[in-house]
Every structure is written in structure tokens, then in C-alpha cells.
Swiss-Prot record:
InterPro entries registered for this protein in UniProt: BTB/POZ_dom (IPR000210), SKP1/BTB/POZ_sf (IPR011333)
Cross-referenced CDD domains: BTB_POZ_ZBTB_KLHL-like
Name the UniProt record assigns to this protein: Putative BTB/POZ domain-containing protein R830
Organism whose genome encodes this protein: Acanthamoeba polyphaga mimivirus
Listed Pfam families: BTB
Signal peptide stretch: none
Superkingdom assignment: Viruses
Length: 477
């Protein structure tokens, strides 16, 4: 029932409620029957305490405006339609105090200069997983850590990551995304088709939709057009498959190797060609997948390894079976065969089945150490290169994955929202050894490419160093 007119005119009011916070007071004329029936706090008060017979009650609250708005809502009066972060937290505190249903708001963004206020409000709410996440997500880079309890700092540090991600969406817009702060920021209005991160100079190499190549220095945030040709040496320590970035020496290599393979096979046809090339991390070897189609036999696939130093080309595999996902590992290569549904390792001129009966292998990658990761349509498999065995399997649906550390990966999965054809993306982090999700969030865009880059603000490292220094001081004293 709408009691808006009754409230505004003050008709039949039987209680003056005086709300008081630290700086303000506000008097409103209300009706005990409405408070009693709608708000459990007043139900208890009017049933069991002397206030049930009082014409005036003074009530200390966190914020007089917020509590007044809550009470007015039971009269059918709509109030703050665009609440800021502080209002939302004070509303949560007030609803909880009044014993009404409430949910702590997620993903609030607090200005750096208001972090002290956030601390005060969290102190009232109490420390729990959600409020500590809130503090971690909003901790200013230059905040004086000595003002915070060491136990709280440990909890905050455990929630930080030493990386963030760069994203290109399906509309070719580029974003930076922080998994800790859960903050998605469009970097520029320019559109891009592809990108790679080079750790040596802390640069993103970007191919724009106008075919031009740009570099963005992540330390200085300076974006400039790259006039010179991109060299393969720029991709040092990268597992490079297909790329939209034009690399002249790459194209020249393809043409040269294609001619050599055709000569090797004694066949030159318009129905053949290189389908993919993959570079070893040190750029000394190149894997080449070559396909030849013949009407009577269908598609035939070869896998060649080219040694850059000796200029020798070696055939290592041939089959009437599509080959993909070639990956260089310390003592050989790993690849996937589609019809036989096998992941195969080639090392010391010998073949070994790594995993069999795997449908739809999307990606094979590894941490440049021991852990090999095989991503299929419904799970990822962790394979130990040293022990030559599967150490874990995790059921999940991901489109693409990237290693963040030796144990942590980040992946994403695109999905349609229920009531529209809009595609959103779920970003998830996993500990590959335990199989546990360590973080996840949905973003309102369709991800086309995701690249992990280091956090140059070093927030996690700064927290860790400060905690260690305090612990050392305590031991010394």
C-alpha cells in the first residue's frame, strides 16, 4: 500500500523519530504501526521496551539521510536512484542494524582520497572475505601501510596479483583489466586486430585495423607508430602460431620452405601449402605443417622441423590426419592429431602418446618448466614433462588459457546472455595442481584476444616486502 501522501502531510503520525549521526540530526514524523509491521528492529522495540509508549524517540545511526531513505521506502517513497559507494555501504550497515535483509555490495570503486573512510566503514561492518577483498581492490598505491594491522596486510597481500591483462574484444577495442580490482578500462579509441607483449622492453606490439603497427610502452603509456618492420627476434621466448602482424622474414621463410618441401615431395600443386608455422622459444628451430590435397586420397599432412643454424629441413611425421597445436618443449615437440585424437610427443627421433581419445583439443601450452597444459572442449589436463604422466584433470569450459605462474593460469569463455544475443565473457583463474578456481568474473564484452602482462606498480611485491620487513624487525627486537 502507498502511504506516500500520509507521510508527506504528516497525517495521523504518532511518533517523532529523531535520527542522529556524528554530524547531523533529522526529525521525521512516522507511524508506529508501519515501523512495527515492516522493520524487525522496531517490532522488537515496540513489543518489549518502554519506547512503545513514547511520542518521541532519539536514534543514533550511521547516516541520517540513509536511514531516513530506508524508512521512507516503506511509505512507497523512492529516494536515491544513483547511490555512490559510500551510500551503498552505509545503506548495508543501516539495513543490517534494522535487521532487514541486505547484501554487501560487490565491485565498488573508491577514490584514493576516500580510502580512510572505507577503512572506517569496513571496521563497522567487520572483517570477512568480502570486506578484505574490498580493501584489496581499492588500496591506493601510495598508501601509508604502517597505519594498517600486519594481519590485515597479510590478508590483503594474499588477494593481490602481480599481473594484469590486456584484452581485444570482437569489435577490435582494447582494454586493460585488473583481476584484483576487477576494473575494466578502455585504453584507446583506436581499433586493433592483434597484439603481443615483449617483456624485454615492456612493450605491446599492436596491429591496428588500418594495417599499421604500433608499439605501446606499458611503463610510460606512450603509444607510437612502429615505422620499421617487426622482426622475428622481437618474438624471442614466444610460442608464435598464426598472427595478423606482418613479419617480412616470416613470409619470406614460408615461401622458401614451401619450395623446398615441394621439391622434397617431388610435387608442385595449387592444392598444397603451409598451414601453420611454430617457432621454438629461442628461435633456433621452426615447426612447419604442410598440407597436400589429392582428389583420390584427400588431405595429407606433414610435420617438418627446420633448424635455423644448419639450414636443414627434417620430416618427422606424415599422416592422412590434420596436425595442429605444435609446441616446442626442451627435448622435442608436442602436437595434436585430429582424427586419431591423440597428443603426441616427438623426442630423440621417437614418438610417444601423451594423451589419447581427446576430442577437440583447443590449445597446448606449458610454463617453460615441467607443466604441460592440454585444453579440450570440456577440461584441461596437466601433464608432467619430467615424470611423463598426467598429474591432474579439471572439468571446465574455456576458450583460451595463459600461464600466469607455474601453478596459476587465467582463461576465458564466451557465452550468450539468457535474454539477448549479446555475448559476454567469463574470466577464470585456476590453480592447475589443486584444480581450484582462485578468481572469476564476468565482463560485458566478447573477448577476441587476452594477453597477460606484469603489474609495473608492483603492489603485491611492495606489500610482501613491507610485511617481511616488519616480521624481521619483530624477530630482531
Amino acid at each position: 500500500m502507498d502511504f506516500k501522501k500520509v507521510f508527506e502531510l504528516g497525517k495521523f503520525s504518532d511518533l517523532e523519530l529523531i535520527l542522529v549521526d556524528k554530524t547531523n540530526s533529522l526529525s521525521i514524523n512516522v507511524h508506529k504501526v508501519i515501523l512495527y509491521s515492516a522493520i524487525p528492529y522496531f517490532t522488537t522495540m515496540f513489543d518489549n521496551f518502554k519506547e512503545k509508549d513514547c511520542p518521541s524517540i532519539k536514534m543514533e545511526v550511521i547516516d541520517v539521510v540513509v536511514v531516513s531513505d530506508i524508512i521512507k521506502s516503506f511509505y512507497g517513497i523512492e529516494t536515491n536512484n544513483d547511490p555512490d559507494w559510500e551510500y551503498l555501504l552505509k545503506e548495508y550497515i543501516s539495513l543490517d542494524y534494522l535487521q532487514l535483509s541486505c547484501t554487501l555490495p560487490d565491485n565498488i570503486k573508491v577514490p584514493d582520497e576516500c580510502f580512510e573512510t572505507l577503512l572506517d566503514l569496513v571496521e563497522i561492518i567487520g572483517y570477512n572475505s568480502k570486506t578484505i577483498d574490498m580493501l584489496a581492490n581499492n588500496l591506493p598505491n601510495d598508501f601509508n601501510l604502517s597505519t594498517l594491522p600486519i594481519e590485515l596486510l597479510r590478508e590483503i597481500e594474499s588477494r593481490y596479483y602481480d599481473f594484469y591483462t590486456m584484452i581485444i574484444d570482437r569489435d577490435n577495442r582494447m582494454y586493460s583489466f585488473n583481476m584484483c580490482r576487477k576494473k575494466l578500462l578502455q585504453v584507446t579509441n583506436k581499433k586493433y586486430d592483434d597484439m603481443y607483449y615483449f617483456s624485454v622492453n615492456d612493450n605491446l606490439v599492436l596491429k591496428a585495423s588500418d594495417k599499421k603497427i604500433y608499439t605501446c610502452n606499458l611503463s610510460t603509456k606512450i603509444l607510437k607508430e612502429h615505422k620499421e618492420n617487426i622482426s622475428m627476434t622481437d618474438f624471442h621466448h614466444h610460442h608464435l602460431g598464426e598472427t595478423d602482424i606482418f613479419i617480412p622474414e616470416n613470409e619470406a621463410f614460408k615461401e622458401n620452405i614451401k619450395n623446398r618441401i615441394q621439391k622434397y615431395l617431388n610435387n608442385s600443386s595449387s592444392n598444397d601449402g603451409i598451414t601453420e608455422i611454430y617457432y621454438s622459444p629461442d628461435l633456433t628451430q621452426i615447426a612447419v605443417i604442410f598440407m597436400l590435397y589429392q582428389e583420390e586420397s584427400g588431405e595429407m599432412y606433414w610435420l617438418f622441423i627446420y633448424d635455423c643454424k644448419s639450414d636443414k629441413l627434417k620430416k618427422i611425421y606424415f599422416k592422412f590426419d590434420r596436425i595442429s597445436n605444435v609446441l616446442f618443449v626442451p627435448d622435442g615437440v608436442i602436437f595434436y592429431t585430429h582424427c586419431s585424437q591423440k597428443v603426441i610427443a616427438w623426442s630423440n627421433n621417437k614418438f610417444q602418446d601423451v594423451c589419447c581419445s581427446l576430442k577437440h583439443v583447443k590449445q597446448i601450452t606449458y610454463d617453460l618448466g615441467d607443466n604441460l597444459l592440454i585444453l579440450t572442449h570440456n577440461k584441461f589436463i596437466v601433464y608432467s614433462l619430467n615424470n611423463k604422466c598426467v598429474v591432474n584433470q579439471v572439468n571446465c569450459v574455456l576458450d583460451k588459457i595463459e600461464f600466469v605462474s607455474k601453478e596459476i593460469i587465467i582463461g576465458y569463455h564466451k557465452f550468450y546472455t539468457n535474454k539477448s544475443c549479446v555475448t559476454n565473457t567469463k574470466i577464470i583463474m585456476y590453480n592447475i595442481l589443486t584444480g581450484n578456481e582462485t578468481n572469476k568474473i564476468n565482463v560485458d564484452l566478447e573477448i577476441y584476444k587476452l594477453v597477460v602482462v606484469p603489474d609495473k606498480a608492483r603492489t603485491k611485491q611492495k606489500l610482501k616486502e613491507y610485511i617481511e620487513s616488519i616480521s624481521t624487525e619483530r624477530i630482531s627486537s
